[in-house]
Swiss-Prot record:
Top EC class of this enzyme: isomerase
Organism: Symbiobacterium thermophilum (strain DSM 24528 / JCM 14929 / IAM 14863 / T)
InterPro entries: Chaperonin_Cpn60_CS, Cpn60/GroEL, Cpn60/GroEL/TCP-1, GroEL-like_apical_dom_sf, GROEL-like_equatorial_sf, TCP-1-like_intermed_sf
Protein name: Chaperonin GroEL
Gene3D superfamilies according to UniProt: GroEL, GroEL-like equatorial domain, TCP-1-like chaperonin intermediate domain
Reaction catalysed by this enzyme: ATP + H2O + a folded polypeptide = ADP + phosphate + an unfolded polypeptide
Amino acid sequence: MTAKQIIFDEAARRKLQAGVDALANTVKVTLGPRGRNVVLDKKFGAPAVANDGVTIAREIELEDPFENMGAQLVKEVATKTNDVAGDGTTTSTVLAQAIVKEGLKNVTGGANPMILKRGIEKAVQVAVEELRKQAIPVETNKAIAEVAAISANNDREIGELVAKAMDTVGKDGVITVEESKTLHTELETVEGMQFDRGYVSAYMVTDTEKMEAVLNEPYILITDKKISAVQDLLPILEKVVQRGKPLLIIAEDVEGEALATLVVNKLRGTLQVAAVKAPGFGDRRKAMLEDIAILTGGEVVSEELGRKLENATIEMLGQARQVRIEKEKTTIIDGAGSSEAIKNRVAAIKRQIEETTSDFDREKLQERLAKLAGGVAVIKVGAATEVELKEKKLRIEDALNATRAAVEEGIVAGGGVALLQTQKAIDELIKTLEGDEKVGAQIVRRAVEEPLRCIVENGGLEGSVVVEKVRTLPVGHGFDAMKEEYVDMVAAGIIDPVKVTRSALQNAASIAALILTTEALVTEKPEKKENNPAPNMDMM
């Protein structure tokens, strides 16, 4: 076992803070309408240009192992906020930095970190409740377009596209982002279906960076059987290999020898194959497999229907233009099923919805209907260069996530204003607290003004002056950093989803409180490199 080095108390916390600052200072230059870009060096190909907090955070690895721990903890804040809300990663990083900075001052001054943590948690809870009170529901297309445009760094064109996509497939529809072969960014609606089952083995992925498997024009084998013996699969595998196309297997399960054979063939490049478990359970699983079969123009290979897997023919397999498989979901795009058969199936499901008395069944039937009839909207991103394309694609993904979050929990004034305006609620809480708990709440009160301060400073103005002025304005009014004037934020279209703002604050406080309560850091001791002395010339 390698030797470890340990540091304690103040020294440990200072190292963590240095790591937090290194990461946060890099990320926060991108915040706001006048935020700058960060260029990331790639080992292969051109450098990447990013304006997105989590993308930048993921690239940062510090040399000092203790400082690196601090940076990795804040990276966790950005990643967690991105996972939950899909946006707000820069805001959460800025908040975490502010809470750590203020908190460490107090811990150094003798405050008890555990009680500080309690105060921080209480203040965050009050702030989140206040954000929910300020929330305005998002219903119109105009509101959706504004949310999307802001998240895409004030790009109106992207805002319109996302709003149009949501309008086409509905708020629960599936929207994916692909790279276009042209210079233009456009919207395409594709008949498609998504279900919540991912690949059976991670060895099946085709894109290791995104951890997803993409099969173009695959055959699709649909069966309700558990496949473990490779003998059952061999006949159909041989037929597919002869055709030279990828294969997607949807089965109750694929395991043992059969799974090993598929993985080995995939890794050797003999056959591009992916397997997913069938969605749903019991009778609903049979119905969903039937839906997939109708959508792709295939048949369900089931012994109940007198079809054995070892006798399966190519004609029984479904087909689609593309299948995308992630860890927990699969999307079938442009199935080859006949539109007549799909129409009949949709009509049958609608009849079942009318006849059913159970709310649960109705909900599940409506889900199936949306999957069959709703389709998938594809935003095809076009740009002049590869670097611009990647940057634009990231912004569109951000905009999509922000918009979904806005539809879910509503919106509040953007530009860091809603957070600042939770201060009144926090002040009320502070009056009821005492000692270090009160100090903890005051730390959060100070931290919630940091995003606004940062946006203003990125615009080249004095943060403190603007923060003081916004404090005196009515709720929902704040500072437009683009035009440099005080406005009604919602009317001016400067808005943030509640879910994004709330997640940013909750995740930042959670990690920052961990850093404040840290008393020791343990890391591996770097091995000393031995210098081999050059041979003496006399020895030659």
